[in-house]
Amino acid sequence: MTKIAWITDSMANFSQEEAARLGVDIVPIQLIVDGNGYSETNLSLEDLHRYMIDQKKEAKTSQPIFGDFIGRYERLKEEGYDCAIAVHCSNGLSSTAKNSKAAAEAADFKVYTIDSHAALEAQQELVRIGKAAEEEGKSVEEIVALLEAWRDKKNFFMIIGNMETMRRGGRVSSGEMFLANILNIKPIITLDETGKVIPFKKARSLKKAYAEMVGELERRHADNGVKDNRVFVQTALSPKMQDDFVALIESKLPGLEVVRTRFCPSIAVHAGFETVGVLWLDA
């Protein structure tokens, strides 16, 4: 029987306990704050907020350290693993998957690299689906094909409540932010089929933005269903936004289970802290 190792990165947002239970090795995304490097798994949202908002420090993300990747794959080879399946965040968000593949080649270790076309719970779900398939005795090739099919079932939408972080990161201009603030515009973003961030809609208030996202959830639920009847609602540090959005989902779609989660720090670096998102897989 093939001995398979499982790898993912910290943008999957696994808790340490869940990763340990599943037997998944987490490679951390790096955060650079005011020139100092931090492993994403060792920096909380609260600490990041203090640095970025209270202390006005600049922050950005960086892919996992290449040498760490090589070291992990060399260790797995020494431990007798035949191969690894590495489920990584979208190439549209980070170069992690490309570096993972390059590190595997450098370590001369067979790794099946999966670009999840997503992050967060969509990335998590792929790992869980793959682990379940492994337990059923499916071959590596069958597992990889299964994951490549499931990754196209992801749905993700996020409201940007405050554009200041995006302005500081150069993603919007000061003029665009000023106009959005004056008109109370709340941008909604989504991921395209390859996992690249693209605009979805602009709403003229938070209430209208919530309605847009729930309306999209209703339409897609009617067309494609929702895996396990479960949706994930994320925030960074805006519990009131999360509460209001969850209440609307539960009023419109009472048959769905809503799981509240938090964005990982690498998402907050780019999108800010006044955010709420919803994610699910088609059935």
Q: How does the language model describe each region?
A:
Residues 3-5, 11-25, 30-32, 41, ...:
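Mixed-charge interfacial surface used for oligomerization/domain docking
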Residues 36-86, 90-106:
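Class I S-adenosyl-L-methionine
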